Each structure stands twice: as structure tokens, then as C-alpha cells.
Amino acid sequence: MDWFQALVLALIQGLTEFLPISSSAHLILPSQILGWPDQGLAFDVAVHLGTLLAVMMYYRRDLIAMVGGAGLAVQQRRMNDDLKLGLLVALATIPAVVFGFLGDDFIERELRSALVIAITTLVFGALLWASDAFGKREFSLARLGVAGAIFIGLAQALALIPGTSRSGITITAALALGYRREDAARFSFLLSIPVILGAGLLKTKDLIEQQVVVDWGMMALGVIVSAVTAYLTIVFFIRLLERVGMLPFVVYRLILGVALLFWLA
């Protein structure tokens, strides 16, 4: 992989990680369509770290509040809203961990193809449109309970399939339950933190075990470009969300899915 390809892939990761259009699909497609080499474990770790830093910076107040809520709960010996939100994020993370552990090899072997991406892009794009168009959009996260968190967590597990979009499917699930767009996105992005962190740690473990030679300059490029791009993308997405909803992303998914099917025909 050369520097130009690294720059493009870092930009793609930063732009697509938090938009409901599937980052994994957009990272797979350059190798499928353009014949680019695989980005490699080291660069994968770098762009995961970059996007993790971006979402943690944007939601730093929520993260600080959750930690403070845990301390306050111990002191007062009762639950509070901040600790509750943190526990619900942890609970909703479990299905993705379980299904990832059980099905990762099958997914890597059988589902990383342009055809699968085309189908999931269209199907889950349609579900995103339906939940946004017909969801009540009246509840705040204060209403979220165990059942809702598990439902969103199970939806997140589907994002292991390339083309689904982790943010897209979790926002779809939250909208279907009647949550407001901004609250659906907030829970989705908070939910991304343990998932990205876990994926990054696993890849780091593989990196160490395989004794991969690391190009530190290219790693730095991946971290910086993906972090800055991801942060700006989150800012843009949250501001756009209440004004126009999910329609632009649904249209994009429709165009991408149909274009892929024509390319495969």
C-alpha cells in the first residue's frame, strides 16, 4: 500500500465510520473494484484508533458523566441516570461480542464480497428509511431500558455483515423504538466506543503475535487523518440530522447498491 492509498483509506474510514452507510463496505470495495492491496493489520489498528479518539472527544462530557455517575452511585447507594446510561451501553455491547466471537471466521470467509455488500446496502437502507419515516421520534434516552438496549444491541450484531453499517442499524433500531433522531444517534455513537475499542485491541493482539513490521509514518497518517475526518463527520451528521433526517443517506445507499449490482452483472 502506498501513501496515496493510505490517505484515501484513512479518509474513507473517518468519513464512513459514523455515517449510516457502512465503513467496512467502503474499505472492502477499493480492493474489490480497484484491485488495491489489503490495508494490513497495522493500518487497520491506526484508523480504528483515530475514529475512537474522535468519538471519545465529541462525547467526552457523556463519558465523564458516566464515570462520575458510577462514583456518585457508590456514594449515594442508588442508581442515577448517568450510570444507567453507561450500564445500558455495556449491556447493548454484549450481543456484538458474542456473535463476533462465534461468527467472525464465517463472515470473513463467506460474506466479504461485493454482492453481499450490494444486498445489505439496499435492504438495510430500506429499513433505515422506514424507521425514520414511520418511527414516532418522541422519546429521549432517559426512557431507554434493558429491553430496548438489548434490542439495539442485537441489531448492532447484524453490523458484523459487511454493508450493514453499525451506526445505520443501531440508529434504525432506536428510531423503530420511537426515539428522537438525535437521541438515536447519541446512543449509537456511544455504543461504538466499546466496539471500536474491542476491535482495535483484538487487531493489536494479532499485530503483536504476527510480529508485523510497522511503518510508523503511515500509522501516524492513518490516526491523524481518520481522527480529524471522523470528528468533523460527527459534527456534520448531528447538525444535519434534525433538519433533513436519514433520506440523503438512504438515497446514497440506494445508488451504491444498484451501482454495485450493475457492476456485478
Swiss-Prot record:
It comes from the Bacteria. It is an enzyme of class 3 (hydrolase). It is a multi-pass membrane protein. Keywords: Antibiotic resistance, Cell inner membrane, Cell membrane, Cell shape, Cell wall biogenesis/degradation, Hydrolase, Membrane, Peptidoglycan synthesis, Transmembrane, Transmembrane helix. The chain crosses the membrane at residues 1-21, 39-59, 83-103, 114-134, 144-164, 188-208, 218-238, 244-264. GO terms for molecular function: undecaprenyl-diphosphatase activity. Its EC number is 3.6.1.27. One of its GO terms (biological process) is peptidoglycan biosynthetic process. Disulfide bonds: none annotated. InterPro entries: UppP. PANTHER family: UNDECAPRENYL-DIPHOSPHATASE (PTHR30622:SF4). Bacitracin is thought to be involved in the inhibition of peptidoglycan synthesis by sequestering undecaprenyl diphosphate, thereby reducing the pool of lipid carrier available. Catalyzes the dephosphorylation of undecaprenyl diphosphate (UPP). Confers resistance to bacitracin. This is Undecaprenyl-diphosphatase. It comes from Alcanivorax borkumensis (strain ATCC 700651 / DSM 11573 / NCIMB 13689 / SK2). The gene is uppP.
